[in-house]
């Protein structure tokens, strides 16, 4: 049997009732999951802090950790905003999940992650993505079609794009790595199983090339 690590997505959004997450959390715990992933879709800071605190409390009831990811076009857009959220809520099961694509787009560097207290981090989403027209992985326009398309259906295998995956991984503690790599073109070419195998194979090769054990 393959164990389950995390479930998603426990979002904070004004039109969603977070109480509806409770049955999913209960089932996740039954399946042996340890983590829940969430994201914030409002810029109302007081509101999302309150909601995150309640979700973290709900997750704790089932022995789950709640991990919030930052995305440049979401309510919590970068690492510093995510740190502020965790520091404000003060829940002992609340963490930041770093997605290497979103972090790269937000301008997060390996050096910045290395300077950050490792207590904030719990797991990583691993993937690559193309640079913008100027060759920079950071895209300033949050409505940029490349940003949205890549995130939803065009992520690249590690080493194919412009993200400093090695720098980010080396800048964080030794925590679980979860490959999140939706790519409809690759799935069409290779099939679901073939794409999954390519994800794992390229990640292993990338880590070996960059001296990551």
Predicted regions mapped to residue ranges:
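Active-site acidic/histidine proton-transfer and metal-coordination neighborhood
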Residues: 3-96, 105, 191, 210-213
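Histidine-acidic metal/acid-base catalytic patches
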Residues: 27-32, 57, 79-98, 104-213
